[in-house]
Design a protein with these regions (language model features):
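ATP-dependent phospho-/nucleotidyl transfer catalytic cores
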Residues: 165-269, 281
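Short alpha-helix boundary/capping segments
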Residues: 116-120, 171-182, 294-297
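Active-site Asp-x-Gly
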Residues: 267, 279-301
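Short pocket-lining segment of the protein kinase catalytic domain that shapes the ATP-binding cleft
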Residues: 156-164
């Protein structure tokens, strides 16, 4: 039941909640710049810390034991990624994974700061821990272990989609209409699975609206600064329409995001560019990198 003072109380509560989220983001960012070993975790922080005992526990669903795991490639970026080639104590089983993908704490303090402030690692670990099982096998890689701690320290043990014929795409790749249609089918399945889900008030409470995401206020501030810098720079000959739009967005960005939140709520991937997708031999399409997921109308994807 509403009371005559609700219109006064709600903005205050929202402001306090926003301040708390920004405070948490700053604490996370502060922890991120510390040397990795200074913040203890109950899990390996990097692929180099992963040993056979840890992997055997993560892969205990399989009726065999690992006898070796060696890196066969990897990249560093927003997170560190290493592909491991696996050797098992049994050669008579065809369904054992031959590789896994380790996604872990960024080696760069700069990248850790961004990942920590925006809770990107926590988002992805919780997605695989709580939400992944509600989706079909094509939507995302299978996850064997998901851990996240303070200051962007995290580690995921993921299926290597290449082992089932998956083809990760790059931003510069060309696709055809069939790939685009398959992506729409994947997004439809994702959004339908969590459409107005009561789980958003339960185990999926971490899937917040965009404006409630940790660090989002800091992100908007950064975007404003970039637009302001572009507007003041003589280096770019910006058309009048672009200048007017940049000024409008700078003045109204919070209201714009509030308007974009209107409508039926579901879980969205939040970063559906081509480089976060992969194709499968049957023509279906899946999604990688679930760090930016949030709750919104499905059209935002």
């Amino acid at each position: 039941m509403s009371t005559p003072t609700d219109h006064l109380v709600r903005p205050i509560v929202a402001g306090l909640s926003g301040t708390a989220r920004t405070g948490r983001a700053l604490v996370e960012a502060a922890a991120a710049v510390l040397p990795l070993a200074w913040v203890p975790t109950p899990f390996p922080r990097t692929a180099a810390d992963v040993d056979l005992d840890f992997l055997n526990r993560a892969l205990s669903r399989f009726p065999a034991r690992l006898v070796d795991a060696r890196p066969v490639g990897g990249t560093n970026g927003t997170t560190d990624r290493v592909r491991l080639e696996l050797a098992w104590n049994r050669d008579d089983l065809d369904d054992l994974p031959r590789h896994v993908f380790i996604k872990s704490t960024p080696s760069s303090a700069k990248n850790r700061t961004m990942v920590a402030a925006l809770a990107l690692a926590r988002n992805e670990a919780l997605f695989y821990e709580r939400a992944r099982s509600a989706l079909g096998p094509r939507i995302a890689p299978e996850c064997f272990a998901a851990h996240a701690g303070l200051g962007a320290r995290h580690l995921l043990v993921l299926e290597d989609i290449a082992d089932r014929g998956g083809d990760p795409m790059a931003l510069c790749d060309d696709i055809d209409a069939a790939y685009a249609r398959a992506m729409m089918a994947t997004l439809g399945e994702l959004h339908a699975a969590f459409w107005e889900s009561p789980r958003f008030r339960g185990d999926l409470r971490f899937v917040r609206s965009e404006r409630e995401r940790p660090g989002f206020a800091l992100l908007l501030r950064q975007f404003r600064q970039v637009r302001t810098k572009l507007l003041k720079s003589d280096e770019y000959d910006l058309p009048r329409e672009v200048r007017e739009m940049a000024e409008f967005v700078n003045a109204n960005d919070w209201a714009l995001h509030a308007n974009w939140e209107r409508g039926p709520q579901t879980l969205i991937h939040g970063d559906t560019h081509l480089g976060n997708s992969f194709g499968l031999p049957d023509g279906s399409v899946g999604l990688l990198d679930w760090q930016v997921l949030y709750r919104a109308p499905g059209l935002r994807d």
